[in-house]
Amino acid sequence: MDRRFAIVGALKCEQTVLGIIGDFMIQVDSVFLSVAYTEAGAGYQISIRSCHEKLRADKIAAYICDGVGGGGGHAKKAGGKILRLKMQEKYGGKSVFEVVEMRLCRYIDDNHISHWSNVGGRMENGF
């Protein structure tokens, strides 16, 4: 199944800039959900934006960060923190991009969100 989401890693930037990046990404017709992330202190800050009613940003943030940090927010806009050490302990040598993508795909599959597929979006190291 193709996925209609985008994941982008940003060089060190402020949380508000991550939100702006996410807002830009969901302006693309084929992208219903965006996850932007950056290094922050002892881990990574993530920002999630959604324009699809079945893809609640707050629930996705909590799901992605479960066991490695914490996340939450609102239905369309949310954020979270992934602690580097906890991520390494739980996921071994996987990069933050790989962890976010894996957890996001699992969330979509576990929640049977499939009727939205058509065009996939993936952007790594885009900003």
Name every feature range the model reports, one short phrase each.
Residues 1-127:
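Hydrophobic helix-and-loop "lid/oligomerization" segment in the mid-to-C-terminal part
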